[in-house]
Amino acid sequence: MMLTVTMNPSIDIAYQLDDLKVDTVNRVIETHKTPGGKGLNVTRVLSQLGDDVLASGLLGGKLGEFLEAELDKSAIKHSFYKISAETRNCIAILHGGYQTEILEQGPYVSAKESKGFLEFFEKLLPKLEVVAISGSLPKGVPVDYYSQMIAICKQHQVPIVLDCSGQALLEVLNGAAKPTVIKPNTEELSQIMEREITNDVAVLKHALASPIFSGIDWIIVSLGSQGAFAKHGQTFYKVTIPKIAVVNPVGSGDSTVAGITSALAAGASDEKLLKKANTLGMLNAQEKLTGHVNLENYDNLYQQIEVAEV
């Protein structure tokens, strides 16, 4: 079984408007409310693949109850740690080809709750094949929290796929316990390296060979429409993807994480892991809904992806 962790989940609310008018009333005909957060996007895709997955993280209040009820409707297994504060809302306004987002920061998590979740989390680890940790940390949680979670996974010899950014990622990179996989994009890589990282193969190879990534088995860098660049052990790969009609790119990174997680659990080869991850990322981009893939198109895209050692 695979475990996904979303420390700062949300109720994602989507409003579709022909035009967003400022300083007046905008009436919405259709509203979509779905369980949100990067880890839950990963969960949905793994579930669609037919993988055995359990969703976890922090939930609180009536919105937390709503989120669990929505997961139940989708037959997604979950085991969340309950906190006293309310789970957040995140609003996306789709208007005239644009997307304006209003994101609540999320609940405050007490020191007692932070400690409690680590104990709760450790009890979930036996018999797990892979843990995927995604997204931001809520207020109140120590900035090295992901490092603590990774250390616990290491004690139980469970591989970890980590998809986060900013200070939380830097803490992990500078810490003793390393994840199995990280998935930065070039912007995030530039922040880590404190210099501009382009899509150039030589530049990427030099960056990923930096000592800051020592101990991390896989580094998979998203290059958007240009595919991906990866380092596994001491081997580098360039992944070339076909051109597709993009409908909604939001969540494509999470779908890629789902592919990585699924392939790791299956013991897939390097080529199969990279092709599966990128196929699912593209499939997500072809759909209106975030964290959804049309598997009827899977084989067609999979066969068009090229993985070359460089």
UniProtKB/Swiss-Prot annotation:
Keywords, in A-Z order: ATP-binding, Kinase, Lactose metabolism, Nucleotide-binding, Transferase
Catalysed reactions, as listed in the record: D-tagatofuranose 6-phosphate + ATP = D-tagatofuranose 1,6-bisphosphate + ADP + H(+)
InterPro entries: Carboh/pur_kinase_PfkB_CS, LacC, PfkB_dom, Ribokinase-like, Tagatose/fructose_Pkinase
Listed GO MF terms: ATP binding; phosphofructokinase activity; tagatose-6-phosphate kinase activity
Keyword Kinase tagged: yes
CDD domains, sorted: FruK_PfkB_like
Top EC group: transferase
EC number: 2.7.1.144
Protein encoded by which gene: lacC
HAMAP family for this protein: LacC
Name of the protein described by the UniProt record: Tagatose-6-phosphate kinase
Cellular-component GO terms for this entry: cytosol
A single BP term in Gene Ontology: lactose catabolic process via tagatose-6-phosphate
UniProt pathway: Carbohydrate metabolism; D-tagatose 6-phosphate degradation; D-glyceraldehyde 3-phosphate and glycerone phosphate from D-tagatose 6-phosphate: step 1/2
Family statement drawn from the similarity comment of this UniProt entry: Belongs to the carbohydrate kinase PfkB family. LacC subfamily.
NCBIfam families per record: 1-PFK, lacC, PRK13508.1
